[in-house]
Amino acid sequence: MILYPFPPGSALKCGIAGFDEEKREPAAELYLLAPGTVPPAEFDGGYLFCEAPGCRDARLLQPVQVAAPDAPAVWCDTQVSGGSLEGYLRGLLPVWGDRLWVYLAPIRMLFPVPCPSGVGTPLDETAADALTARHPSHFSPELVCRYCFFRDEDGDAHVFLYDTEETCREKLNLLRRLGVRRVFGEIPQT
């Protein structure tokens, strides 16, 4: 597996050298782009990542949801809405193989229950800490994250999904077991 750990508090528009765990040596560089920007002329590394459209460089990783079948490199994240993370990845690996990159992006999101859209509201660290202090949390082996289930003052049900350093390590272990070759994002140091 080649790991591309984001530096703590990293801003966009920076390069990250990959590290090949098997060969124990540096690998190709991944460059993080701010939305609507282009890579610097001197960047001759292997790949580019930007979550928003705007870059037309052939080295750009394409999201699996919109990538053409012959895309040279695609990415997905580890945040699944329903089902299981392992099932989601097992569905992608036969299609994309070594072209699949996985973005280890810790989740911290509040969802109404039910949530037909599958889209929650991101919470900042303060709001997340307040929720976890008031409500017991549990580990979800399917989503590979922690969650709190509660009802608000109006009786409406909510679930708060969030990652910890431990759940990120669990996700990383799952990715290794599945044979994922390239992982980038907030990778805990083990």
Q: What label would you give each PLM region?
A:
Residues G97-E170:
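Glycan-binding loop/region signatures in secreted carbohydrate-active enzymes
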Residues P72-S84, G155-F160:
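Surface-exposed cleft-lining segments at the edges of enzyme active sites
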Residues L178-T190:
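Acidic/aromatic/glycine-rich contiguous surface patches that form carbohydrate-binding/processing clefts
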Residues T78-R99:
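Catalytic-core region of carbohydrate-active enzymes that cleave or remodel glycosidic bonds
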Residues M1-V80:
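Chitinase-like catalytic core of GlcNAc-active glycosidases
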Residues P39-P40, G83-L85, L110-P114:
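Extracytoplasmic/secreted cell-surface and envelope-processing proteins
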